[in-house]
Amino acid sequence: MKVVSSSKARLGVVAALAISALITIQIVPASAGGVDFRKAVAGSGKGITIGLIGLDDSIGFGKDVHDSIEREAKKAGAKFVFCDGKLKGDVALACAKTFKLKKVQGYLNFNADAAASAAICKAGPQVPVIAIDIEQDPCQSAFMGADNANAGASTGKAIGNYFKKNFNCEYDAFISLEDYGVGIANELRMGGYRDGFASVCGAIPAAKLKKYDAGRLDKALEVMPDALTTLPGKNKIIVVAINDQGIQGAFSAAKAVGREKDIWAGSQGAEKTVWCDIKTNDHWLGATAYFPERYGEIGVPYLIDLIKGKKVPFQLKIKHVAINGTNIDKNFKVTGC
């Protein structure tokens, strides 16, 4: 994820590998580490109240995370308090204050505004906190979510492999749809794209690199028409985004001006909303799965452990799976394409 957000603070959430209807590409795993999913143990949360500051339930990734955490909290027998952060730091701050009033004993924080994290920590109850996908200093007891640098590098390398095999590493531009509001997650993930690509095709010349603070659907729709206008007649345009929505916007914008075949894209997330795109669009070079529908199988059991005073690893990173046209049906039930 995940990363999607407001102009000041947006998440991202998930990293891509190559998929093509014509060839098979050698890919590398998005993450060599990570923790296993753990389903909540019945009764383990009895008498405990846990909370979640959500990303934004209007976003598929955020809603999937919310639903999975609520599901596992119910299995554990814990009382669950949800407050939607709606991509805004001030809203997440109000959520933290609500948690204090409701005597939440531990919470998961998917606040999208990294700059607001200190204020949120201060306003909320002084209890164990697990950050989701975005650092929540200084009160996070653990960080759960993407292995951002490796996920980005995996995507970049896969795109590099594709361009090396098909175009001898020749390309017209490398457009990076980023999300500055999410802080270090953006730097790691988007920098990872560039590092991975450079490991195959060499460093990206400054003249070819075009970075935009446009990691969500609406922002990508805004910037891509102008970006394509600066590249008349070019048909080897690489576009990477901090999440799936950015690439959805990129393809929609390109299609509107008859240039959807001029861009070659990679995203992060492999959300359900893009499964058919990954499977059928040979210019969408793939995505690494973050499994937001299973985040609760990490967040809830480890948060309960923290509340009970048990030691928990600080890094609770997802074991990503590289999704492409040849394996998507093995990992997801893709229908209706």
Predicted regions: what they are:
Residues M1-T49, G124-V127, C337:
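Short, low-complexity disordered leader/linker segments with a strong preference
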Residues S31-T49, L177-E178, A185, F197, ...:
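Hinge/cleft segment of the Venus flytrap/periplasmic-binding protein
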Residues K74-A78, F197-I204, L231-P232, K255-K261:
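Short helix-capping segments at alpha-helix termini
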